[in-house]
Amino acid sequence: GTFRLKGDEARESVSKALEVGFRHIDTAQFYGNEAQVGDAIKTSGLDRSELFVTTKVWYESLGDDHFIPSVHESLEKLKLEYVDLLLIHWPYPGNDISLESYLGNLAKAKELGLTRHIGVSNFTIDLLDKAEKVIGKGEIYTNQIEIHPFMQNKKVVEACKEKGIKATAYMPFAVGKVMKDETLLRIAQNHDATPAQVVLAWMEKRHIYAIPSSTSKVHLAENLAYGGVHLTDSELALIDDLDNGDRIVNPDFAPDWD
């Protein structure tokens, strides 16, 4: 993940992530770092087929006049011919642009070969139902939503599973809050692991895909090594119990959450 990373920091962080073995890079038009992400990809020397690159269309670009040109602009900055996954970053907050219209534009981007897969972000269950009706079942690759131990978004995650849509977690570490939580620290100690590794292992058990972010090469490598952490059923239950609906991302244009 590259949210909040700008300029050289974004470029260096992605370079470090690729060096330690990450192959999925997540960016967005709104992050203002697509060009730096593109630089890091180019200088990595990695074959395009090895990478999975995601970007997102900002809600101000969802209209017919802006949607496809904005994707072309993203690709130009990323120095790529296509992305692997293109997401609607947020559902359009007003009534000026209909869901049918911008999801139609998303499907068109796929038809044009600008992306291999399409998906959504910050969609509620109701919006997912509507989206399936517009672009068809099986077309939505993922719904990227806020998920961490303190905000588990269980209803939406369950709806995604039922629909065969991957639930992807942004902010999996709750902006560092997981590193200080006593329960997670205790479980981490049991496994000679970091709280971040514990959270990633828990997410995998719950069939949630995560996009962790770090500027530290050490932490990036640790995050990638979470597979060695095997949580017990009682530890998984303890983490499940940390859920208190503590949402971090809630802008004024957000939908009515589930």
Model-based region annotation:
Residues 67-88, 108-112, 134:
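CE4/NodB-like, metal-dependent polysaccharide N-deacetylase domain
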Residues 1-51, 81, 105, 238, ...:
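N-terminal binding-site loop/beta-alpha segment at the start of enzyme catalytic domains
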Residues 91-258:
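Beta/alpha (TIM)-barrel catalytic core signal, keyed to glycine-rich beta->alpha loops juxtaposed to Asp/Glu
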Residues 22, 80-83, 115, 140:
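A structural motif
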Residues 37-42, 71-75, 106, 128-132:
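Short, well-ordered amphipathic alpha-helices
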Residues 4-8, 28-36, 60-65, 93-97, ...:
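Acidic-and-aromatic substrate-binding clefts and catalytic sites of carbohydrate-active enzymes
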Residues 6-17, 63-78, 99, 128-129, ...:
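Short, acidic/polar
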Residues 48-62, 82-91, 146-147:
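A short, structured active-site edge motif that brings together acidic residues
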